[in-house]
Amino acid sequence: MSDQGRCGWRRLAWWVVLVAVVVPPLGGCGGPDPPDRLLIATGNPGGVYYALGGALAEAARRDWGARAENVETAASVENVRLLAAGEVDVAIVVADVVAAAVDGTPPFDAPVRLAALCRLHDDYVQLVVRDDSPVQQLTDLRGLRVSTGSHNSGTEMLADRILLAGGLDPEVDLQRRRLGLGEAAEALRRGRIDGLFFSGGLPTPGIAELAGQLPIRLVPLAEYVRPLRGGYGQLYSERSVPATTYRLPAEVGTVGVGNLLVVRADLADRTAYAITKLLFDAQPDLVSAHREAHRINRQAGVATFPVSLHPGAADYFRDTKRF
């Protein structure tokens, strides 16, 4: 493991210890109080967020009799805005967007008060091109038609950061397209764009479907982890996409970043407890929806940097005695 990797794990371990020590027991929580409504902001159909959100909503309808819906969105940035406005109750959000939201930095105009219920799986940034494309590295995108993800998505924010780290201005040096995953995959298949960015779990269903229609490659991006960490903190890590994921020619290094299940910080403790409990009770259903859900676990779940674990969620983890 690299020095950066060891350093990152040490920070993660200290964060877990900090949560365990600092968050006090909630003797008055009184157990779960399931809400009557659970609107879950997720992302594009064809992405992992959407698959997991659909399974969680179905579990809430079945177990609670709640009015629960999987809300299709542009993903992380829009999810935070919907959550802050009270239009949804819970959201799946990538950690770098959470950091920007709580700090009130672009694309947010002011700090947003959030808390986390659980850390979920990791996203992998996937820069997809056709197998016969001349694009071999990020800088080969100059002048080409590239989808950087839906507007107001975590994909767009991170794609822009990676492009800037590579010396490319996404507004000047690319023919930028802002497409959802389904639109972008279809455009690449038809030759209407030259590449697409998407940040998601593995395999991303929409990319797997595209790979079944034509040979594709992923462009290596791992070299940009260091400048991203230098510019934006320790949220990013080096990850590899196995060749078997999409029948790729070889394993590809890329940028990884965690995902969190988040709520407004003022959510009632008993409601936060109930939603966290539902997440783990319904985990078999989530795994059936997408295998990345098997990565959800109590040990890593409390490591919700860069935002605090909600006290109600902390109480759930204590009650299950695996904290």
Labelled PLM ranges:
Residues 2-16:
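Bacterial N-terminal signal peptides that target proteins for export
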Residues 35, 65, 75-78, 85, ...:
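Extracytoplasmic
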Residues 95-97, 105-106, 133, 170-262, ...:
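Pocket-lining segment of extracytoplasmic ligand-binding domains
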Residues 30-32:
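Bacterial signal peptide processing site
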Residues 25-28:
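C-terminal motif of bacterial Sec signal peptides marking the signal peptidase cleavage site
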Residues 252-323:
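Segments of small-molecule ligand-sensing domains
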Residues 88-122, 132, 201-204:
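Acidic, polar ligand-binding/catalytic clefts
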